[in-house]
């Protein structure tokens, strides 16, 4: 099975990078999966955590502002998908482009949205009383 992970970057300490390193290593070691990771690591900067050497990396550039950036992201994403031909695409990016992936790629592969967060984030209550009931 071929997996394509879409993540913003893995060159900083954080939960997404650590979970991704652990999960992808498990998939490769125990199931023999072929794992590809697409990042925006600014030219293949060294990942913060150690990743399995069998992972195939795809680094893309951020180009333009908002609409032009989304269009450039779509073109680069489609190129990588056509090269890799993944069985599943896992999106671990909770930014706007992460939510847009299913619309950007069409129906070629199943898309799984994986979100990592912390229960220790300070949440503010709604300021409108009718919304906080």
PLM region spans:
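Active-site proximal beta-strand in glycosyltransferases
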Residues: 3, 88, 104-121
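An amphipathic, basic-hydrophobic alpha-helix
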Residues: 63-89, 98, 130
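N-terminal strand-loop element at the rim of the active site
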Residues: 6-13, 26-68
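A conserved mid-protein helix/loop that constitutes part of the nucleotide-sugar donor-binding site
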Residues: 14-22
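Nucleotide-sugar donor phosphate/pyrophosphate-binding loop at the beta->alpha transition
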Residues: 71-73, 110, 117-133
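Short His-centered aromatic/hydrophobic patch
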Residues: 91-97, 115
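Short, charged/polar "capping" segments at the starts of alpha-helices
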Residues: 43-48, 98-99, 121-123
